[in-house]
Amino acid sequence: MAGGSKPRHGSLQYWPRKRAEKAIPSVNWSVVKGDGKTDSFLGYITYKVGMGTALVKDLTDKSMTQGKKIYMPVTILEAPSMKIYSVRFYKNNKVLKDVVVSNDKELRRVILAPKQPKSLDAEVPKEFDDLRIIVFSIPSQTSVKKTPDLIELAIEAKDKLAFVKSLVGKEITLKDFLKYSLLDLRGLTKGKGLVGPVKRMGIGLKAHKTEKGVRRPGTLGPWHPAHTSFRVAMAGQLGMFSRVTYNNKVIGSGTISEKNINPAGGFKQYGNIRSSYIIMKGSVQGPQKRQILLTPSFRPTKLTAKKKYELVEMQL
């Protein structure tokens, strides 16, 4: 029987293939927009709980299963509250001023917070083009860890400064953000460590009488040019890469106090959900307890936008 053949799947879109430097990827906020109708911030920090099966009612118009109950795989993300750490003022795409407005004790685990936070009213510069906020999660509300995660978020509002002033010192919840049915999920993939070129780049195995190894590339390149191209399939790091999954459908959300979805004994390798949660259709990159940043979808498709589902029951 002949062996199967396929092209190598080592995409050159992502390079260099090395471990990500940050747990939460940076975002190009110039392309992320909200609905344009309400004042909102454009990101939220969550933690991956795990996967399950959801029984949903398909409400999609002209769907083959319209009005019927169907099963689909879902991913559950826990979303504890967040707070504003500082307000950044920009001018000509450069940071003009960074005003720290919080010194919560949770921050002492990751940064050197000031003993006394500054007043935002007294520190507003005379001229600025844009402002963003640096928020930190409160993972002590979860069973994951105690160290908060910080990320810079953009804001969409008619009066951004007034909107930020209304949020300073208050806890931001998932309900304040969740106004979208499609979300982009940013996070790191599951780390695999050092792996060979067959698993990493998808090259084929050599014949059984081949010298110098079967799971190796046939050549590293010609004699001249006398250097090895970065396109050559070689062993190296696999996983722990920064990736974005686009147009993920929101199936449902809530809080544990309203509806408890914890299975008996808790979720495997995670524990029990203690705060708010969001249920997404399909799979999400990364292992359990990995940080996932939610942002509004910046290039939604008509097909995914028109799909509607009503959560009936979770089966975990």
What kind of region is each of these model predictions?
Residues M1-T189, L194-L316:
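Extended basic (Lys/Arg/His-rich) segments that typically form rRNA-contacting surfaces
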